[in-house]
Amino acid sequence: MSNRMVCREASHAGSWYTASGSQLNAQLEGWLSQAQSIAGPARAIIAPHAGYTYCGACAAHAYKQVDPSITRRVFILGPSHHVPLSRCALSPAEVYRTPLYDLRIDQKVYADLWKTGMFERMSLQTDEDEHSIEMHLPYTAKAMENHKDEFSIVPVLVGALSGSKEQEYGKLLSKYLADPSNLFIISPDFCHWGQRFRYTYYDESQGEIYRSIEHLDKMGMGIIEQLDPISFSNYLKKYHNTICGRHPIGVLLNAVAELKKNGIDMNFSFLNYAQSSQCRNWSDSSVSYAAGALIVH
């Protein structure tokens, strides 16, 4: 008998999204049916990681750009919310459970990444506490449902990386991004505004607070679309926008920059933007969500 597989449970099912597979399937189908597919297929997507009642509809716009028939490996880069981490970490699990079906971690890619010496191993507890990767698993399972036995996942928890570390990880992962059979999912939520987030930037010239937040987010989104890691870093230094996923975005932008050096032509476009609520007063708070896709020409 072989040892039992190490499984990461769907720890946020039943709270951040429904634990019922049939209900979840119907919700995801509903949101995806409302989204348009643009010029695809996406090599990478940016999509939010909040509870599905808040961001399920927004995320669908990114997942609609995925071509499951060519995708064999799904890299998921999410920020660490609970543990201090200065590097990137790999999961100790072999299987990630979802209410739809189980997803298998690509142990060969994991072994190759581990060999670089650039990664830590997170504990199963840390993995199950974290939601930034898990919130992409049901959508990944749904997008890939007709090819469920033909793909694996590569979850990577991204720490609070320095600019030079973002560049190193971007360089390392660029060879995987160059492969059309790989899909990268980058997991940020955008502005966290309000006193509870200790961030209350307000540009009165934009009108209501929520308009100012949208203007700030869309400025950042426009810079991400330029695919220039240095401009994005400068934007964050100037406005301190509370994008919890800035480091996964930084890694993607650096991977893209590496491929551009080799003459690979790409463009990124955002397809949807949403806010959890519209802030009008100083006592209000909101989180913003954005969905977009990277297309390689």
From Swiss-Prot:
Q: Which residues cross the membrane?
A: none
Q: Name one Pfam family in it.
A: Memo
Domain of life, per UniProt, equals Eukaryota
Mind telling me which NCBIfam families this protein's record contains?
A: AmmeMemoSam_B
Q: What does this protein do?
A: May control cell migration by relaying extracellular chemotactic signals to the microtubule cytoskeleton. Mediator of ERBB2 signaling.
**Family to which the UniProt record says this protein belongs:** Belongs to the MEMO1 family.
Share what the entry says about its subunit structure, partners included: Interacts with ERBB2.
Q: What is this protein called?
A: Protein MEMO1
What organism is the protein native to? Answer: Danio rerio (Zebrafish)
